[in-house]
Amino acid sequence: MQRLMLKSKIHRARVTEANLHYEGSLTIDETLMKAADILPYEQIKVYNVFNGARFDTYAIAGPAGSGVFCLNGAAARMGAAGDLIIIATYAQYDEAEIARHQPKVVLLDGDNRPLSQGLKACLS
């Protein structure tokens, strides 16, 4: 049996901008995408901590080290600069893979810099 499990998460990213007139997506600092094992154009789920909005879009890489998290297109209506968001990806795993699976989790500070990595960091 296959189960849908958390693959990766960027926790408490601060939205840096919203661009309603871009074609869509969420622009994410390329360094943070790599740390969280998120590929360009991969489907992502976004959870806005400030307003409760939850939506699906896809990731595009922004400049490495910039700390950018830009809501693009229709997603720009789901939040504003300064909002805290959680970005998650999911993948299907079989029972053998689940036994050894650990999601990639990147916890950010208020300036979108990594504080720590790993699920335990979010729980403490």
From Swiss-Prot:
Pathway the protein takes part in: Cofactor biosynthesis; (R)-pantothenate biosynthesis; beta-alanine from L-aspartate: step 1/1
Active site: S25 (schiff-base intermediate with substrate), Y58 (proton donor)
Pyruvic acid (Ser) found at: S25
One CC-aspect GO term: cytosol
GO biological process, alphabetically ordered: alanine biosynthetic process; pantothenate biosynthetic process
Keywords: Autocatalytic cleavage, Cytoplasm, Decarboxylase, Lyase, Pantothenate biosynthesis, Pyruvate, Schiff base, Zymogen
EC number in record: 4.1.1.11
Compartments reported by the entry: Cytoplasm
Cofactor or coenzyme needed: pyruvate
Source superkingdom: Bacteria
Enzyme's top EC category: lyase
Binding site for substrate: T57, G73, A74, A75
Entry GO MF terms: aspartate 1-decarboxylase activity
PTM annotation: Is synthesized initially as an inactive proenzyme, which is activated by self-cleavage at a specific serine bond to produce a beta-subunit with a hydroxyl group at its C-terminus and an alpha-subunit with a pyruvoyl group at its N-terminus.
Cofactor binding notes: Binds 1 pyruvoyl group covalently per subunit.
Catalytically driven reaction(s): L-aspartate + H(+) = beta-alanine + CO2
Known function: Catalyzes the pyruvoyl-dependent decarboxylation of aspartate to produce beta-alanine.
Quaternary structure and interacting proteins, as annotated: Heterooctamer of four alpha and four beta subunits.
HAMAP family referenced in this protein's UniProt entry, alphabetically: PanD
Similarity annotation: Belongs to the PanD family.
PANTHER family, sorted: ASPARTATE 1-DECARBOXYLASE (PTHR21012:SF0)
Protein name: Aspartate 1-decarboxylase
Organism for this UniProt entry: Syntrophobacter fumaroxidans (strain DSM 10017 / MPOB)
Lineage of source species: Bacteria, Pseudomonadati, Thermodesulfobacteriota, Syntrophobacteria, Syntrophobacterales
